[in-house]
Amino acid sequence: MTTPAQAPREEVSLSPSLASPPLMALPPPQPSFPGDNATSPTREPTNGNPPETTNTPAQSSPPPETPLSSPPPEPSPPSPSLTGPPPTTIPVSPPPEPSPPPPLPTEAPPPANPVSSPPPESSPPPPPPTEAPPTTPITSPSPPTNPPPPPESPPSLPAPDPPSNPLPPPKLVPPSHSPPRHLPSPPASEIPPPPRHLPSPPASERPSTPPSDSEHPSPPPPGHPKRREQPPPPGSKRPTPSPPSPSDSKRPVHPSPPSPPEETLPPPKPSPDPLPSNSSSPPTLLPPSSVVSPPSPPRKSVSGPDNPSPNNPTPVTDNSSSSGISIAAVVGVSIGVALVLLTLIGVVVCCLKKRKKRLSTIGGGYVMPTPMESSSPRSDSALLKTQSSAPLVGNRSSNRTYLSQSEPGGFGQSRELFSYEELVIATNGFSDENLLGEGGFGRVYKGVLPDERVVAVKQLKIGGGQGDREFKAEVDTISRVHHRNLLSMVGYCISENRRLLIYDYVPNNNLYFHLHAAGTPGLDWATRVKIAAGAARGLAYLHEDCHPRIIHRDIKSSNILLENNFHALVSDFGLAKLALDCNTHITTRVMGTFGYMAPEYASSGKLTEKSDVFSFGVVLLELITGRKPVDASQPLGDESLVEWARPLLSNATETEEFTALADPKLGRNYVGVEMFRMIEAAAACIRHSATKRPRMSQIVRAFDSLAEEDLTNGMRLGESEIINSAQQSAEIRLFRRMAFGSQNYSTDSLTRNSYISKDENL
């Protein structure tokens, strides 16, 4: 019985020669599998199938070709054979002829192992495999064992090459992920080669034989110990040290059936058989094959089993070049996108800056004349005592709540933005108890903010026709105006079609109240002069020192608020423009305010700074006379204060008799000079010709002179000259000549002439 066993072993060695075609891919795997093949034949003889092996050698030669054409179909049938009679087919194919080769396999494996080790390092191994066939006959037994190793390789090769080994015949070429395909079709003979790394190339060639090879793996487990002794263990050990550690760890796992599941779920049945065989011998040889396999499989996928090693480097270079190109393309695209984004951001920033500039110039139209159609002839005098009959049209469909955005503060800061609900709470629901008064633009309510600050809330009747943006621009311009004689704005509110302005609360009411309210003690002369001077300063600031210039358009005594010390504050400046821009309809009821309107406004509809000057002249007449601008209680023809005062003003300037004009409440408790100056100022302000009216700055200087001491020291104009004018003119000419250097004059002549002039004057 022992002799027949030996015979099959020899036949196994010969079978490799017949299976030379697979050797093309075997260069890397041969070293790893000679031992495996030897072991497999030993197990096969144990099965007692030597006669069948003789028949299989012939079959083994054609199978390598068939795998190229259609490896998947052939591997699929072997799977059943593996499960059923794997040992019979395997011993039949390799062992019949190689009775002499047993010694050779032992010798050949060493060369095969060295050959296998170099191929992983360099691509040239393909030629050596062709030369190695003589030696490979010994290693050829490895191919039967190769199919078993493949099941293990998929885990290691899946990253670089595993797909290539199954792909080389037909499936590995299309995609690197072909292993799944082979796993379903063959019993894992094709797919496992990639995991085994080295066995994978031979497996690609053997795919035709895998039925028999796959069957071999099942019997090898018992025979493997013998084969390990035959192939040089040192060669097998060499591969193990290099990178086999991971593969070896996998090998122990492979002896157990888990490795096949790793390869694929379909081939677990065939895989268990190869796994035991692989665990016995290949573990040592497989590590080198694993090292070699990574380069070889990709090449097999590209060309075939013949060009596995050389093709691998090329695909690697192609991948590197393609990856470099892709990286460059990505970098270029990213740079282009970044540039596009930067340009878009720049365009947006420029647009925003331009829009801000446009908004900043919106408030510059305060000086523009108001069209005649926008108001009736009597509208100027009733700007703050008008009622809007037009429907309130809102350009917002939903309530908007605004919270305070900035603190009230210095010049250039934005006002606070209040919510409507906040103002409702502050004014106690805009109750009548908090009502301070009603003007042409709406009612004014007293309110207390959460920080206990007292404010005056003005509900504008202008509605929402202007639009939020325009209204905000106007309010922002008004809120930037700060002067000690101007009422500062605290904030505003926009809610649907509601427009509200919030001002500092002034507790001492207004000038109209103190002059004309019943039961009031009236104002003394000093207080009246103080109020007139303060209002003049505030109005002059709006006309000349404010940018953009603001025309109040509604100067009257009710818009001059008084603090507790009777410090005058001009209020409601700029609101007339808001109303006119919103096309607010002005009612015809102008009683009490009609007398402030300038005559040119009624005739031409134009408003200028001189229109405010005329209105301020009417306020001065109120302070002087204590009468209302329009008083229906006066006799017919004397209802208008301006028309009644004109003849009296001219008479007072000529005769300096002020009794007819002075307020009866004053009696004679006034300073004559100050009364005269105030009468002159009032007469100049109410002139019919707008061009002949003084500027507000001139009126301010006139009031300032009332408080200053006489700079003339009691001397009349012309009496202060103590030097001869002729002599003085001569000295001036001399200085001019000296300055321009036209002629040379000595200083002696200048001093001599000056002394002479002094002596003459004495």
Curated annotation (Swiss-Prot):
GO molecular function: ATP binding; protein kinase binding; protein serine kinase activity; protein serine/threonine kinase activity
Annotated TM spans: 329-349
Pfam families assigned: PK_Tyr_Ser-Thr (PF07714)
UniProt topological domain (Cytoplasmic) ranges: 350-762
Extracellular topological domain residue ranges: 1-328
Disulfide bonds: none
Subunit structure: Interacts with KIPK1 and KIPK2 (via its cytosolic domain).
The protein's name in its UniProt record: Proline-rich receptor-like protein kinase PERK10
Organism in which the protein naturally occurs: Arabidopsis thaliana (Mouse-ear cress)
